[in-house]
Design a protein with these regions (language model features):
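Extended, small/polar residue-biased N-terminal targeting/export presequences
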Residues: 55-61, 67-140, 193-248, 309-311, ...
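Acidic/histidine-rich, surface-exposed loop or edge segments in extracytoplasmic proteins
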Residues: 17-26, 38-50, 89-93, 187-191
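PDZ/PDZ-like domain segments forming the peptide/carboxylate-binding groove
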Residues: 53, 69-70, 92, 99, ...
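N-terminal-proximal low-complexity accessory segments that begin disordered
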Residues: 30-72
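Boundary at the C-terminal end of the N-terminal hydrophobic targeting segment
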Residues: 13-15, 183, 199
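Bacterial N-terminal signal peptides
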Residues: 1-12
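Extracytoplasmic/secreted proteins, especially bacterial periplasmic and envelope-associated proteins
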Residues: 36, 40, 58, 62, ...
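Cleft-lining beta-strand/loop regions that shape enzyme active-site pockets
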Residues: 23, 29-30, 46-56, 194-201, ...
Length: 480
């Protein structure tokens, strides 16, 4: 998409300098565990993945291209000469390095990315020295994924001039004046530079191994330990912490919502939009200043074992003195993603609707309870809403299907060795609900949603209503 811009930068006299110098951005080094993980992941993918492929120089070239595009998706950071040099040096050796668990190439490429990003943001800051003359015509490509990399620094400068103009005009359209625009963008670009200093080896490894995994199959992913933990929490709809949703605003962790009944809400001393400026462990652990930290690092400090204590230094939304609040961590259920029942009156009849956002662990048991609740409301029909449901646990979809059929197979799965396993209804000869049913789907209904809808259609248990589904005919398995 091309957007027309109006504007021209006047000449700069005194360029705004970054608050962080380039020598402060240090590339993290991979640990021995990172190398071991790389070797194990490579062995697992080459030996056991359903899609058979050969990890050779040709495939390594594809991994290289995907890695570059994941690092610089808009083609505005690297120069074409960078790509040519990196390709010549590393593209054909990635296969050998993956087999050996070596990460030299992956980290060297990322090192150059950090350097180029710093240079680009430094240049962007320099453009804020003088107010641009917003007259004349210019244009910017919003989507540059298929555009060529800039050949020269001058070409890159033009791309970033257009980007900065675009951001200036957007702020002008919000009735911002130049001094405020300059301050806003200077803060934005300096925060972007600061984030470069917070890069972790786990981040680099996850991006690199995902460039490998996604080249094999669009649904194969590598998760770092932190990402794997978050995935498990989302599948179980529970975590151990204080029950607050956090976001980063102007380098400060801000509370966006509170889970009813969780420790933060129970304290009645924390409110939405309060800021967390410090975190301490236990009754007497030192309070660490967390301003400027990565959000995921702050979250890790706040989460902890059920029953343990965490102390938060809170800056109230309305200002004033900060206060220290001690909370006892507890198990928190993520209710937003749980199945929910509503009963609507349609043409004088009570129709129950069970909305299932995802096939999480424990879903079937939750739906059992909702079906029992539904009976008490004398519903004459049931709608299972799977719109936007991207899937989840294979075990749960098999067990959930069993609530609505008496017996029989639900789905069959073929593995990498051509072995076929038929997954049967685990509760043969029984069904919890045998009344009228409809299943609602759309183009984002995928995986487990498709298995459920197809099974109920095949058994003539439900009318399927909606759009053609996503079409994901594979089953993922988690391996550590």
């Amino acid at each position: 998409m091309t957007v027309w811009l109006i504007g021209l930068f006047t000449s700069q006299v005194f360029a705004i300098e970054p608050q962080i110098q380039q020598n402060e951005i240090v590339l993290p080094k991979p640990s021995e565990q990172h190398k071991i993980s790389t070797k194990r992941v490579t062995a697992r993918l080459t030996q056991s993945h359903y899609h058979k492929f050969k990890l050779d120089d040709e495939f390594a070239g594809k991994i290289f291209d995907r890695y570059i595009n994941m690092l610089d998706s808009m083609h505005m950071t690297f120069l074409q000469s960078d790509i040519d040099e990196l390709r010549e040096k590393y593209a054909s050796v990635l296969d050998d390095q993956l087999y050996e668990g070596q990460l030299d190439a992956a980290f060297a490429i990322y090192d150059l990315l950090l350097k180029r990003r710093y240079e680009r943001y430094k240049f962007a800051l320099s453009l804020l020295d003088n107010e641009p003359d917003l007259k004349g015509n210019d244009e910017i490509e919003n989507d540059r994924e298929k555009s060529p990399f800039p050949k020269t620094v001058e070409e890159a400068d033009k791309l970033w001039e257009a980007r900065v103009k675009y951001e200036i005009i957007n702020l002008h359209l919000k009735d911002k004046k130049w001094p405020e625009i300059k301050k806003t963008l200077a803060k934005r670009y300096n925060l972007a530079i600061k984030r470069l200093t917070q890069t972790k080896a786990d981040d680099i490894l996850q991006t690199y191994l995902n460039s490998f995994a996604l080249e094999i199959d669009p649904h194969t992913n590598f998760l770092s330990p932190r990402s794997a933990k978050a995935f498990q929490e989302s599948m179980n709809l529970s975590l151990e912490g204080i029950g607050a949703t956090l976001s980063m605003e102007d380098d400060v962790t801000t509370i966006k919502s509170l889970v009813p009944g969780a420790p933060a809400a129970r304290s009645k001393r924390i409110a939405v939009n309060d800021k967390i400026v410090g975190v301490g462990q236990g009754e007497s652990g030192p309070i660490e200043d967390v301003i400027g930290w990565r959000l995921d690092d702050v979250v890790d400090k706040i989460k902890g074992k059920k029953g343990s204590k965490v102390r938060l230094e809170i800056e109230p939304e309305k200002g004033g003195k900060t206060k220290i609040i001690t909370l006892v961590r507890d198990k928190v259920r993520i209710e937003d993603s749980a199945a929910k029942l509503t009963v609507d009156k349609i043409d004088g009849k009570n129709i129950a609707v069970i909305k299932i956002p995802t096939f999480y662990i424990g879903l079937t048991e939750d739906v059992r309870k909702l079906l029992s609740e539904m009976k008490g409301k004398k519903a004459e029909g049931l709608i299972i809403d799977l719109r936007e449901n991207g899937g989840g646990s294979l075990t749960e979809v098999i067990e959930l299907t069993g609530l609505f059929i008496k017996e029989g197979p639900v789905v069959q799965v073929r593995d990498a060795f051509d072995r076929i396993k038929v997954h049967e209804d685990p509760d043969a000869d029984t069904s919890l609900y045998d009344g009228k049913m409809m299943v609602m789907i759309n183009r984002h209904s995928a995986s487990a949603s498709e298995i459920f809808a197809a099974a109920l259609q095949d058994y003539n248990r439900a009318i399927i209503v909606g759009q053609t589904t996503f079409g994901k005919g594979t089953v993922q398995q988690s391996r550590s």
